[in-house]
């Protein structure tokens, strides 16, 4: 039995959890908090979540975990069998997580936790995001899923990253930098999925306590 360890606010935890749910894999879940605690560091050397406990040991990093799940449990695949189409899904994931979410994360302190971000950082983030979002728009299909007509691991990530990026850029930069893409319509479609509804509800319910713990 797999055990997914993390907490409901995390986009990356929810990305992995959605992959497990959509593939129909049985798993346990353990809340792990706070970040950087000795107990967490013993399992996750960088003190990050999510991590997953398997019969063979512990794995960290959300994409590593999703790739393991896909290889270990090939039923209900989340990536195409065709090598080129599979690479396209991973390309979208790279744009989304490395070039968009990670960059937008520089704004989260001000957007969500009562901190401040310097004007220089705001300008740098805005410039990087505009370039990267345009690149994502050139590749993403939104027809109806991010990579085309089949739900994939790219959707498991986008469903949770898009709202965070939209909220952060709107609050800190005064503009939703994703507004030029059909993200709103995409999310409306994805939020019809029962598992997405469940995870989103848990994320929203957990968020106030998470913010309080990080701003107190």
Listing of model-derived features with the role each one plays in the protein:
Residues 1-126, 137, 144-146:
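GST-like domain detector, emphasizing the conserved glutathione-binding G-site
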Residues 11-15, 182, 195:
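Conserved alpha-helical elements of sugar-nucleotide-dependent glycosyltransferases
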Residues 60, 93, 161, 199-200:
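Tryptophan-centric aromatic hotspots in well-structured domains and transmembrane helices
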Residues 78, 197-199:
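Acidic/polar loop patches that form or flank catalytic/metal-binding clefts of enzymes
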Residues 88-91, 185, 198:
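Short, solvent-exposed alpha-helical surface patches in well-structured domains
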Residues 96-192:
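GST-like fold's C-terminal all-alpha helical module
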Residues 200-216:
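Acidic/histidine-enriched, glycine/proline-rich intrinsically disordered or flexible terminal extensions
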């Amino acid at each position: 039995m797999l055990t997914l360890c993390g907490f409901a606010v995390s986009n990356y935890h929810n990305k992995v959890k959605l992959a497990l749910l959509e593939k129909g894999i049985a798993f346990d879940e353990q809340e792990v908090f706070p970040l950087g605690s000795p107990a967490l560091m013993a399992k996750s050397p960088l003190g990050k979540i999510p991590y997953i406990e398997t019969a063979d040991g512990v794995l960290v990093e959300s994409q590593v975990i999703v790739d393991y799940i896909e290889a270990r449990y090939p039923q209900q695949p989340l990536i195409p069998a065709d090598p080129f189409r599979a690479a396209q899904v991973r390309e979208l994931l790279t744009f989304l997580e490395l070039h968009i979410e990670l960059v937008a994360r520089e704004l989260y302190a001000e957007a969500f936790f009562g901190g401040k971000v310097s004007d220089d950082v705001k300008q740098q983030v805005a410039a990087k995001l505009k370039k990267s979002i345009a690149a994502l728009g050139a590749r993403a299909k939104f027809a109806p899923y991010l990579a085309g007509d089949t739900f994939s691991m790219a959707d498991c990530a986008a469903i949770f990253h898009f709202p965070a990026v939209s909220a952060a850029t709107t609050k800190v930069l005064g503009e939703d930098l994703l507004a030029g893409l059909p993200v709103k319509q995409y999310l409306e479609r994805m939020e019809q999925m029962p598992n997405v509804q469940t995870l989103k509800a848990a994320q929203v319910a957990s968020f106030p306590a998470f913010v309080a713990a990080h701003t107190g």
